[in-house]
A protein has these predicted regions:
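Non-globular, low-confidence helical/coil segments that flank catalytic cores
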Residues: 1-182
C-alpha cells in the first residue's frame, strides 16, 4: 500500500476523521510507503496524525519517502523528518532514482540539485507506471519547474495530479499540451 501525501487545511483532524476511516473501510491497516512530496501542512498533517495515533488508530506507516534535500534549512521539512525518524523508517529519493514494488515502477523526476527560489519548487515529482496505467504526481511545483522536467517525462500519462492544486501559478498550457500527452 502506497500513499502520496495526506493532509488538509480545510478539514480539521483529516487523518483521524477522513484518511484512517477510508483506509480501514478498504481493509487497509498498514501503509507500506508514504511518499511526501513536500512538507506543507496540506500535504502532511493527516499523515502526521496517522503516525501519532498508530497505536489507537489502527493504521501503521512502515516507511516514509521524502525528497533528498542536502543543505536544506526549511524548518518544516527538518521538523517532519526528525519527528518521523522516531517511529518510522525514512527513505530519501532524488531525481533519476527508481523504486519498484511488484508491477509498480516509480521514477523520481524532481527535485534535482538545482537551488529553487520558491519552497514549493522542491516538491517531489513522480512518474508511476502500473501495467497500462501511468500517472504523474507533481506536488506543488510552479510553472517555472515544468520546463525543467519535460524531458524526463515518460511518454503519455493516463492521469495527472495537477501541480499546486491547479493554481494559476502552475500547470501551464504548454506543460499539458506539449509532448507530455495528457
Amino acid at each position: 500500500n502506497i500513499t502520496i501525501d495526506g493532509g488538509s487545511t480545510d478539514v480539521k483532524n483529516v487523518g483521524e476523521y477522513r484518511i484512517i476511516p477510508f483506509l480501514k473501510a478498504g481493509g487497509i491497516g498498514k501503509i507500506d510507503y508514504a511518499i511526501i512530496t513536500h512538507t506543507d501542512a496540506d500535504h502532511i498533517n493527516g499523515l502526521m496524525e496517522i503516525m501519532e495515533k498508530s497505536d489507537i488508530g489502527g493504521v501503521k506507516v512502515e516507511n516514509i519517502i521524502v525528497p533528498l534535500l542536502t543543505g536544506f534549512t526549511e524548518e518544516s521539512y527538518n521538523n517532519f523528518v526528525n519527528v518521523a525518524k522516531i517511529r518510522i523508517n525514512i527513505l530519501y529519493i532524488k531525481s533519476g532514482e527508481y523504486m519498484e514494488f511488484g508491477n509498480t515502477k516509480i521514477k523520481c523526476i524532481h527535485p534535482g540539485s538545482t537551488k529553487e527560489e520558491n519552497i514549493n519548487d522542491y516538491s517531489t515529482v513522480l512518474s508511476l507506471k502500473y501495467g497500462e496505467l501511468s500517472m504523474l504526481f507533481t506536488g506543488d511545483i510552479s510553472s517555472k519547474v515544468e520546463p525543467k522536467i519535460k524531458n524526463e517525462l515518460q511518454g503519455k500519462y493516463t492521469f495527472l495530479k495537477v501541480p499546486h492544486h491547479g493554481s494559476k501559478y502552475s500547470t501551464s498550457r504548454v506543460f499539458i499540451t506539449d509532448k507530455s500527452g495528457f
